[in-house]
Amino acid sequence: MSKTKIGKIITLEGIEKSGKTTQAQMLSHYLRKERHLNTAHFDLPDYQTDVGKLIDKYLNYAEMPANPEVLHLLYAANRYEIRDVINFHLNDGYVVIMNRYYQSNLVYGYVNGLDTDWLSILDENMPRSDLTIILDAPVQITEKRGTPVNENRFGPAKEFIEKVREAFLSLAEKEKWKVIDATRSKEDIHRDIIRIVENQF
């Protein structure tokens, strides 16, 4: 990979506890240290922003169950909060690493019974990912890594997450996203990610 005037977006996706945060950090470190590239790393949803705080309140403190349409509109607004920052980095040649992005909106929205065309419209003005990598692991593996956050708002947690995983794999095949076995060590996963990134760019 060589530094260009216009940067790239690499998105890491997958169910909760699949290792996205760790791998995003490792990838960012590798690109800076070994390839001497500028990187920017974003974790979504960002619960520290104004909209993010609304999402957190809506998920955790609302008296009624979360309405899927309202929730996905809020998630979209959360992404739009950082759109200008993403574009700034891209225009400056950065590699932008996304820990979740609009792909999660499509997958979770689909599992929540929402229309995928409507979901796509929500993000049509967001910068597009140049590479999307799915970190795939069965729920039986990820549930041993800790308690998922806000994954069970629409039904039993395990059943819901299994549907999300199936949707990620189905959409990955359709959209030509890369899929990595995330049941292995973080070092093995990192090596696979680097191989994919180097081959892609």
Per-range role (PLM):
Residues 15:
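P-loop (Walker A) phosphate-binding loop of NTP-binding proteins
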Residues 29-39:
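Post-Walker A helix-loop "phosphate-sensing" segment adjacent to the P-loop in P-loop NTPases
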Residues 12:
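Hydrophobic anchor at the beta1->P-loop junction of P-loop NTPases
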Residues 37-121:
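ATP-dependent small-molecule kinase phosphotransfer cores
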